[in-house]
A protein has these predicted regions:
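Conserved nucleotide-ligand handling architecture
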Residues: 1-154
Length: 154
């Protein structure tokens, strides 16, 4: 990455995307594209990739999305979060560092709670909000913009 900028790239299912921003305003950007997983895949991996709290939160969702779509969105969002924060955190961390806490369908946002302190700005209990959208009926895209001003992190 060139000095003074941050960015992210992604590709899947015939789609590709890139995002860049100036470092003074943005600490990191993360984007991810994923194909919505099939039901048999979801059934075989769900309990190994989400926490019991996340599973309970998924159970409370009102049915706007299939469980496969929701799980794909969660995985994609965690990937976007990792891409945006890894350069500042400076170490590898697992997807369990943040925990899904809700979805706002109208605003197309996903909320996550930080459950492992990653940096002074990303401490235990901090809430992050990521955006999502559909590129087609079976392909999702998520993004996380980590801004210097924490009130702008949407």
């Amino acid at each position: 990455m060139a000095p003074g900028v941050t960015g992210s790239i992604t590709h899947a299912a015939g789609f590709a995307a890139a995002a860049v921003a100036r470092v003074p305003d943005y600490l990191g950007l993360g984007i991810d594209i994923e194909q919505v997983m099939e039901r048999d895949v979801r059934q075989s991996i769900e309990h190994s990739i989400i926490t019991p709290s996340e599973a309970a939160c998924l159970d409370l969702q009102d049915g706007d999305f299939s469980r496969e779509s929701l799980l794909t969105l969660i995985i994609s969002a965690k990937e976007s979060f990792f891409k945006a924060t890894f350069p500042a955190v400076g170490r590898y961390f697992g997807f369990e560092a943040i925990e899904f806490s809700g979805i706002n369908v109208q605003e197309q946002t996903l909320s996550f709670d930080v459950i492992e302190t990653l940096s002074p700005a990303l401490h235990l209990g901090h809430r992050v909000v990521l955006r999502f959208g559909y590129l087609d009926p079976t392909t999702v895209m998520t993004s996380f913009t980590w801004r210097r001003n924490p009130l702008d992190n949407r």
